[in-house]
């Protein structure tokens, strides 16, 4: 059998779901997270937030990185910087809110790159941040925004995990790593300017269930709780963080933590890792 077309060297395969979830051209996520269009002034590994940092980190370690995104053009610049630095990378369009899209995308990944060794779920959403103070209570939260939050934080992780678990179980190895935030630790009220975060508790619960089901099969499942704001020009522009830039968390350091989890010896696996700036509060 010949080598996959996108991965002719048969490198280990890392799939990053939501590699550009906050970097949609001219979208509200881009303006919040980055403060402007993605510029050339930042180092490549910091130019596209956590998704970009993860892609560069695993590519640097000799993996073929598959970037999944709803629109291919969202990831083309990121893929180009990985290629120019000697890394191996491909792009596959995927919408976590549509079952058919997930199934089709992973069929392409298996054919063109190979069975994934690492799956990182980094899809994000900002549903509800635009709502005003008089819409703060749950009774005012629009149903369509609720569906968006649930599709991204609950249904999407379930669908993508199903696509990689059979091969990982049969092989007896693999890593599934979920990027989550501090609001996944317990249900909280939604304040003005925040997303509806409680669906993220279900992503955490899924990771815990998968840990119990698949650890014995050699599959390492872990949640990374990012307890704070990820550093970017957009977050640095927030008034509270202009006064306290020490509260920002470096995306490159977060990516290092993901790679550390993947490389752990199976006699000593971490299943949940909480990352907090040294001067920031530790959520509970």
Describe every region a protein language model picked out.
Residues 161-162, 208:
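A short, exposed helix-loop element centered on a Lys and neighboring polar residues
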């Amino acid at each position: 059998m010949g080598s996959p077309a996108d991965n002719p060297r048969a490198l280990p395969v890392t799939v990053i779901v939501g590699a550009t979830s906050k970097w949609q051209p001219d979208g509200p996520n881009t303006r919040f997270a980055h403060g402007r269009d993605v510029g050339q002034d930042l180092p490549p590994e910091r130019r596209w937030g956590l998704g970009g940092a993860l892609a560069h980190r695993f590519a640097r370690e000799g993996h073929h990185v598959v970037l999944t995104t709803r629109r291919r053009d969202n990831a083309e610049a990121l893929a180009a910087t990985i290629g120019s630095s000697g890394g191996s990378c491909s792009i596959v369009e995927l919408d976590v809110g549509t079952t058919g899209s997930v199934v089709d995308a992973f069929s392409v990944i298996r054919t063109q790159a190979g069975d994934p060794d690492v799956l990182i779920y980094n899809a994000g959403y900002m549903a509800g941040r635009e709502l005003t103070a008089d819409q703060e209570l749950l009774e005012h939260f629009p149903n369509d925004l609720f569906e968006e939050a649930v599709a991204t934080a609950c249904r999407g992780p379930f669908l993508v995990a199903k696509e990689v678990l059979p091969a990982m179980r049969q092989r007896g190895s693999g890593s599934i790593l979920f990027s989550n935030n501090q609001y996944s630790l317990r249900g909280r009220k939604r304040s003005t300017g925040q997303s509806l975060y409680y669906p993220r508790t279900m992503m955490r619960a899924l990771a815990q269930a998968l840990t119990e089901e698949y650890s014995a099969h050699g599959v390492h499942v872990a949640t990374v709780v990012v307890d704070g704001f990820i550093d970017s020009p957009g977050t640095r522009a927030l008034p509270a963080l202009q006064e306290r830039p020490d509260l920002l968390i470096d995306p490159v350091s977060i990516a290092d933590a993901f790679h550390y989890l993947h490389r752990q010896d199976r006699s000593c696996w971490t299943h949940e890792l909480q990352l907090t700036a040294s001067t920031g509060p530790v959520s509970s």
